[in-house]
Amino acid sequence: MNMQLGSPVSVHPIPIYQGNYVWVMRHTSQNSVVVVDPGSASEVIEYITQHELTIASIIITHSHWDHVTGIAELCANLQLWRDEEPVVYGPSVIQDVTHPVEDGDRIELCKGVDVPSLQVIATPGHMPEHLSYLLPLTTPKLFCGDTLFSCGCGRILQGTHEQLRTSLDAISALPSQTEVYCTHEYTLTNIKFARTVEPQSQALIDYEQRVRSLRKNDLPSIPTTIEREKALNPFLRYKELSIQQAVENHLRLKGLTAADVFKHLRLWKDSF
């Protein structure tokens, strides 16, 4: 369990598929949890049952199957729910969402305890409807689905490069100590690309060694932090001269704008 010292909220990863995480948030004084992006139900049911917990609510970032497939089965098992009534927050385009939310909305995380509400942030780009959720504690926690990964970001599928760049700029502006909970264990693959862009980065070399050690012991590399990503992630560093020069050298072009650099960096990663 990833427990921030003194934090009233713990966050636990449930691995599913090949490198996905379902995140489970729990107030330390309660036995009900918030489940983030249940792409599969069986592992969540096993965890809930084993730890004698109940589900308070589910929150969803976007509509892809590996984030939503478990919703229906979890909702059908009413005995799993604290109030025997499924509560699913997320984009309105998702069929199983019972409580549609959008940018600027707030979600009560825990009843009867003094914890800030989750803040809903629109983060389109990977998908147009993509939402992220910020828990503004002393050490904030961001659940960002497939928008930001450690040393990487989501592919452009039905969104646009401009949308994704704007979303990542907004995430980058969050407090540096913010913990980032994405839903894929892509870190080593992303570091490989980041080192291609900045081959002289000792910080990337050191981080790769750290992540390899974690993965060797079957431990997640997530959460990361905004501070780390601003130092290492090329998609948050696209305005840096070293990134601009790398992209221009890759394209054999000069004079790219920051928006051009970001777009071509993402296209470079797409074919990497």
Curated annotation (Swiss-Prot):
Zn(2+) 2 binds at residues 66-67, 146, 184. CDD domains: hydroxyacylglutathione_hydrolase_MBL-fold. Its cofactor is Zn(2+). It holds the Pfam family HAGH_C. It is an enzyme of class 3 (hydrolase). Pathway: Secondary metabolite metabolism; methylglyoxal degradation; (R)-lactate from methylglyoxal: step 2/2. GO terms for molecular function: hydroxyacylglutathione hydrolase activity; metal ion binding. It catalyses: an S-(2-hydroxyacyl)glutathione + H2O = a 2-hydroxy carboxylate + glutathione + H(+). Keywords: Hydrolase, Metal-binding, Zinc. Zn(2+) 1 binds at residues 62, 64, 126, 146. InterPro entries: Clx_II_MBL, Glyoxalase_II_hydrolase, HAGH_C, Hydroxyacylglutathione_Hdrlase, Metallo-B-lactamas, RibonucZ/Hydroxyglut_hydro. Belongs to the metallo-beta-lactamase superfamily. Glyoxalase II family. HAMAP family: Glyoxalase_2. Monomer. PANTHER family: HYDROXYACYLGLUTATHIONE HYDROLASE, HYDROXYACYLGLUTATHIONE HYDROLASE GLOB. This is Hydroxyacylglutathione hydrolase. It comes from Saccharophagus degradans (strain 2-40 / ATCC 43961 / DSM 17024).
